[in-house]
């Protein structure tokens, strides 16, 4: 038997990729160009297809040599990601984290998406390492090394390796809060001032001499304690410490949809969240908000009357159990606490903003279902009337009805991109079908309910005015009626059988000649026989009080000549009131 020879070159794949990267930088042997906002990047199809599912689908069955990416992709960000595909290394500034993460999610580069959490936490800082937490001021400005805290205060320590629920489980043992210049704070693990400037280090030893321990009240997932509310001299530390500001977070443009807040019951306990499923999260979060309506916060309950205290209850974050189901595919800001009214840019660079509370509502209601998430986002940005007047696409008007204009393409594309980042397998064709279906449902609801609203209004009234938000307090009447006199119209239609719809419509449309002269009170009578086998009683009341059920009507009824085998139809009589009050059939 011949002897087998085995040759193995260490890191041969990395060497080949390095050579391909050099060829790319020199523009040699590149077979595709990726155009981003007019800037072309040469690359190799095989390398891009091996790194990105997006490019794999794009190149499949397409032999073009140039492809253009959407305008939401920044060229500088794509250049960094392209270099990552060849080298496996990614270097970026702290302010570019969100942009890179969203671009990588759009391009479906799983290596960057899966390591997104580590990428957000591993940010080099002169004030932060594995044992310390960085201190930031309220304005999110980088702090100078010379800035020091007061020696009698200590910061609240948050570590990326410790989940949010563990950080919030602090027992309530003391009701009285010390003054601002009082002793330091200590939780389950005492805090002491470390050797660094103004940095609190969590140790197992006792606190510094002269510091009295103080246990913070117990809080839920939606309220991580902020010492800035208790002791004004202590600066607030957001979680996670790596990310300071998101692109566009400083500008707060208005949106069409109102802000939604979450008001949790004071007696709710942390353990209740552990056993909830995703549907219960959605019901719990929106049970008091209505349909994305602004709701005033209730009055705070005194500390003496409750055993559990929520500190900064307006700060919200995704529950830990929901994060364990969906992972880190949501907006990065949702994993840290923040004001529900804070404006978040849905996709970096898109200019489309949504409040934290609204976005959390969408995720809590959708859970792991990406199609439900798309519907919730569309319902947040577009009201039902806008959807009913639209065709569901952001490209062109409807071919069947040109009056149906497309939805705002900027908002629609941002929503699609966000949902695609949440579920990379979510195809755009499926999103278009869902958007068109929502528009169709909105038109169907409007078509079904507006005739019912019209039937309850007096004839001659524009029914669309009340639907579009106009006040229905003063309704315009027919100009032939005197406007100075108070006019009361009350009508009751009773049908023995529900199948007599034609009879009811005929009675509604029957014209009645009313004598409005100042002569004596004339009475006119109308007699009508219904051919449907059922009788219809039409009763018209004047401003006087209506008779109780069981009493005979004061109106004069004349009985028509009908056969004994068929019920007789009494007909209402309308009279002219001397004070100008009109009563008659409509």
UniProtKB/Swiss-Prot annotation:
Residues 30-94 form the BTB domain. Keywords: Isopeptide bond, Nucleus, Ubl conjugation. There is a cross-link at residues 171, 215, 297, 427, 454 (Glycyl lysine isopeptide (Lys-Gly) (interchain with G-Cter in SUMO2)). Residues 349-446 form the BEN domain. GO terms for cellular component: chromatin; mitochondrion; nucleolus; nucleus. It is found in: Nucleus. GO terms for biological process: negative regulation of cell population proliferation; negative regulation of DNA-templated transcription; positive regulation of intrinsic apoptotic signaling pathway in response to DNA damage; protein homooligomerization; protein-containing complex localization. SUPFAM superfamilies: POZ domain (SSF54695). GO terms for molecular function: DNA-binding transcription repressor activity, RNA polymerase II-specific; histone deacetylase binding; protein homodimerization activity; protein-containing complex binding; RNA polymerase II cis-regulatory region sequence-specific DNA binding. InterPro entries: BEN_domain, BTB/POZ_dom, SKP1/BTB/POZ_sf, ZnFinger_BTB_dom_contain. It comes from the Eukaryota. It holds the Pfam family BTB. Residues 177-196, 236-272, 542-586 are annotated as: Disordered. The keyword Transmembrane does not apply. Residues 247-261, 550-572 have a biased composition (Polar residues). Functions as a transcriptional repressor through its association with the NuRD complex. Recruits the NuRD complex to the promoter of MDM2, leading to the repression of MDM2 transcription and subsequent stability of p53/TP53. Homooligomer; mediated by the BTB domain. Interacts with the NuRD complex. Interacts (via C-terminal part) with HDAC2. Interacts (via BTB domain) with MTA1, MTA2 and MTA3. This is Nucleus accumbens-associated protein 2.
């Amino acid at each position: 038997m011949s002897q087998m020879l085995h040759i193995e070159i260490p890191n041969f794949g990395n060497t080949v990729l390095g050579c391909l990267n050099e060829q790319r930088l020199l523009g040699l042997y590149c077979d595709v160009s990726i155009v981003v906002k007019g800037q072309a990047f040469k690359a190799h199809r095989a390398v891009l297809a091996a790194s990105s599912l997006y490019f794999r689908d794009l190149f499949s069955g397409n032999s073009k040599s140039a492809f253009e990416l959407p305008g939401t992709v920044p060229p500088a960000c794509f250049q960094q990601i392209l270099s990552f595909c060849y080298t496996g290394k990614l270097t970026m500034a702290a302010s570019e984290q969100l942009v890179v993460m969203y671009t990588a999610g759009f391009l479906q580069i799983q290596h960057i998406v899966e390591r997104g959490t580590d990428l957000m936490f591993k940010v080099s800082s002169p004030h932060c390492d594995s044992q310390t937490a960085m201190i930031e001021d309220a304005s999110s400005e980088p702090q100078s090394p010379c800035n020091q805290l007061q020696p009698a205060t200590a910061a609240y320590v948050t570590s990326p390796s410790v989940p949010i629920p563990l950080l919030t489980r602090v027992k309530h043992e003391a009701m009285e809060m010390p003054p601002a210049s009082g002793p330091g704070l200590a939780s389950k693990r005492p805090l002491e001032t470390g050797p660094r400037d103004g940095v609190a280090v969590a140790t197992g030893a006792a606190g510094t001499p002269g510091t009295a321990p103080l246990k913070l009240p117990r809080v839920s997932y939606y309220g991580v304690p902020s010492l800035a509310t208790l002791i004004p001299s202590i600066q607030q530390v957001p979680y996670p410490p790596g990310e300071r500001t998101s692109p566009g977070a400083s500008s707060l443009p208005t949106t069409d949809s109102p802000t939604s807040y979450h008001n949790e019951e004071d007696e709710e306990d942390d353990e209740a969240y552990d056993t909830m499923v995703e549907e219960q999260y959605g019901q719990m979060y929106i049970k008091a908000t209505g349909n994305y309506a602004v709701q005033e916060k209730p009055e705070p309950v005194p500390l003496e009357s409750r055993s559990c205290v929520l500190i900064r209850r307006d700060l919200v974050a995704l529950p830990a159990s929901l994060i364990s189901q969906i992972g880190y595919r949501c907006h990065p800001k949702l994993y840290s606490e923040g004001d529900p009214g804070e404006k978040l840019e849905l996709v970096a660079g898109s200019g489309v903003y949504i409040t934290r509370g609204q976005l959390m509502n969408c995720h809590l209601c959708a859970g792991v279902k990406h199609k439900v998430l798309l519907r919730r986002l569309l319902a947040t940005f577009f009201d039902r009337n806008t959807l009913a007047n639209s065709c569901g696409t952001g490209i062109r008007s409807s071919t069947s009805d040109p009056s149906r204009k497309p939805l705002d393409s900027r908002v629609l594309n941002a929503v699609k991109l966000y949902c695609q980042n949440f579920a990379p397998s979510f195809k755009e064709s499926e999103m278009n079908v869902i958007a068109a279906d929502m528009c169709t449902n909105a038109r169907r609801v409007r078509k079904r309910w507006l005739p019912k609203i019209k039937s309850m209004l007096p004839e001659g009234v524009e029914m669309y005015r009340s639907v579009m938000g106009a006040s229905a307090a003063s309704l315009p009447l027919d100009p032939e009626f005197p406007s100075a006199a108070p006019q009361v119209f009350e009508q009751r239609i009773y049908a023995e059988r529900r199948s007599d719809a034609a009879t009811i419509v005929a009675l509604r449309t029957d014209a009645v000649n009313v004598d409005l002269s100042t002569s004596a009170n004339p009475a006119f009578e109308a007699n009508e026989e219904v051919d449907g086998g059922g009788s219809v009683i039409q009763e018209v009341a004047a401003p006087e009080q209506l008779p109780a059920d069981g009493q005979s009507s004061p109106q004069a009824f004349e009985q028509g000549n009908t056969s004994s085998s068929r019920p007789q139809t009494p007909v209402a009589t309308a009279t002219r009131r001397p004070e100008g009050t009109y009563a008659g059939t409509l």
